[in-house]
Amino acid sequence: MFFKSMGATATDHAALAPYTEALSPGQVETIFQRALKNQASPQDVRQFNGHMQLEMARMSTEDGLVMQLHPGSLRNHNLEVFARFGPDKGFDIPTATEYTRNLQPLLQAYGRHPRLALILFTLDETTYSRELAPLAGVYPALKLGPPWWFFDSLNGMHRYFEQVMETAGLYNTAGFNDDTRAFASIPARHDVWRRLSANWLAGLVARHILDMAEAHAMAADMACGLARGAYRLDQ
């Protein structure tokens, strides 16, 4: 509760894979003791990380902090650059990412919990329509984050609208957030998102799927309302 008392509204979790697994207290303690002795195996690490993702979701049901999950980046791909200059020098590369099975333990436990808000991101666009949109359509706790990192672009946003919205529905997405450390880019990024949102909505109006009043209301939500709701800023 300390972070919430200081104004935090969300947590953010990075993982190579969105793997989750429920372990018993005895299993957790055994792995932890092996880790303290520097004897943990790769399988121990995978299981412990998966269990901790479940624990993070559980804690979010208690403190109400929105849980964000950003998986699928293989960090420091070029080992020579990493050795010479250290981490985070531009060699973080997307990987193929599986969500349906990896997240099943977490979603079985908390996917319908009224106090969990889980926002998922991806660097694997092939999962938009195959996995993420269907998952967001059935688990009330789950929303899809906006196009992230390499896809935070004109074409990336266009693909997102085409692949996500039909199955997930607009209101199972989290709008657009300021997921960047490059603060000077924030106005430009929001400008691109709002223009692409308007373009997508205009296409729906032109095909008589929406009327103008509906499109105007949805445009306001895509610009601001969805994000405020997803991150519980008005609560």
PLM-predicted stretches and their roles:
Residues 1-7, 107-111, 134-139, 164-169:
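Acidic (Asp/Glu)-rich catalytic clusters
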Residues 1-6, 50, 58-63, 206, ...:
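Extended recognition/assembly regions associated with phosphoester-bond processing machinery
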Residues 5-9, 63-65, 114-117, 140-143, ...:
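Short, well-ordered coil/turn segments that N-cap beta-strands
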Residues 9-127:
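Divalent metal-binding pocket/active-site signature
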Residues 21-23, 77-86, 128-136, 154-162, ...:
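Histidine/acidic-residue-rich catalytic or RNA/ligand-binding cores of hydrolases
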Residues 124-126, 144-162, 210-233:
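C-terminal helical cap
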Residues 170-171, 188-235:
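Mid-to-C-terminal alpha-helical segments outside catalytic/metal-binding sites
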